[in-house]
Amino acid sequence: PPEPDLMKRKPRNPRTGTTGQEAWYHPKRITFDFVPPWIAEMGTDPSNGRTYVKRGLLTSRDSLELFDKFLPDPDHPARYEQVARWIEKYREDYAVFARIRLGGASTFESMGLDVFSIMMYDDPDLVKEIHRRFSEWSVRVVQHLNKMDFDFIWANDDHADTKMPWVNLEMWEEFMKPYQMMVAREIRKPWIFHSDGNLFPILDGLLTLGMNAIHPVQPSAMDIDTLKQKYGGRVCIV
């Protein structure tokens, strides 16, 4: 990937009086992604060029062979060598972090929420096998990241929409926690767990993963005062 484009000067917004470069708005940080690709058919929005998942491809036991086709070698040195040079160059002035996944979002997106939900009942072992494979891939990535000079790790795994999580706490503990815990236990740096949506119904379970902070506290889904009162003494709220 190209070298990060750092803080280009922007004109001041006449309405807000800001440039978009203020510390509160655009903190000095650089992200490097170490996430597995979706095993899915992808589409592109012509209006903005964004990619999105059209449909997941992990829908049966036969489809497990797609892991070998889609997932790159997590131990290949090329994944880390250039990043190490960038870290050395920028870390004195910027907070440098690595973005990973614990395996939950990869499972949801690569199966599709509809197939995921059906298979929890029709073939629960398939759901667990898919999550395990994604999580084991991330474990190997994290083992390399631990040796690098990152300031912290960012685990990006959406588990909910604005109304509720996509699984209840009992389902999360059976189908997801064992594999996400594999990754969490491997992390040797401070780390943040990210998920949009309403996490309240499963948050007690999620916190057992041992993250240092949670993000983003979506205002339309979670009341920050309630969150602070109940959990502020247990985890940093970012």
Question: Could you describe each region identified by the protein language model?
Answer:
Residues 45-238:
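Active-site loop segments of alpha/beta catalytic cores
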